[in-house]
Regions:
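Conserved catalytic submotifs in the C-terminal HATPase_c
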Residues: 8-9, 48, 104
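Short acidic-hydrophobic, aromatic-tinged amphipathic segments that line or gate anion-handling sites
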Residues: 98-102
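Residue-level detector of flexible, active-site-proximal loop/helix-junction positions
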Residues: 12, 20, 104
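Amphipathic alpha-helical interaction surfaces in cytosolic regulatory modules
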Residues: 20-97
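Short hydrophobic/aromatic patches at helix-to-coil boundaries
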Residues: 107-111
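Short beta-strand/loop segment at the start of cytosolic alpha/beta domains
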Residues: 1-15
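Acidic phosphotransfer microenvironment of two-component signaling modules
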Residues: 82, 104-105
């Protein structure tokens, strides 16, 4: 998995590229901590290029949501692929995340 981040006015945007699976979980968490300066801003995760997610990947997103919330910041997911949306629905996590059709829409929801 490749993870890139950039600071925007409303939030830090994290772009995921590839799989978010058991093999990527530790790197995901480490990179998120570094990219967000230990959760000092709202976060938008751009899932456009997220190709696959497993149960550990879901746990990683839940961890990110919990960390953001415990630091009084908000998390938004953008451009979630249908396959991942289906997994959210099957695991009953579809209500656990605020999802948006674009990064811009996710950022606007933070205002």
């Amino acid at each position: 998995m490749n993870i890139a981040s950039e600071q925007h006015v409303a939030a830090i945007v994290i772009r995921l590229d590839g799989d978010l699976t058991v093999d990527d979980s530790d790197n995901f968490k480490r990179t998120i901590r570094e990219s967000t300066n230990d959760f000092s801003s709202d976060i938008v995760v751009d899932c456009t290029s997220l190709s696959q997610i497993d149960s550990v990947g879901l746990e990683s997103l839940l961890w990110l949501s919990d960390e953001a919330r415990s630091n009084n910041y908000r998390l938004r997911l953008a451009c979630v692929p249908q396959t991942v949306t289906n997994i959210f629905r099957l695991t009953r996590l579809d209500g656990a995340f605020s999802t948006h059709p674009s990064v811009e829409a996710a950022a606007r929801s933070l205002n």
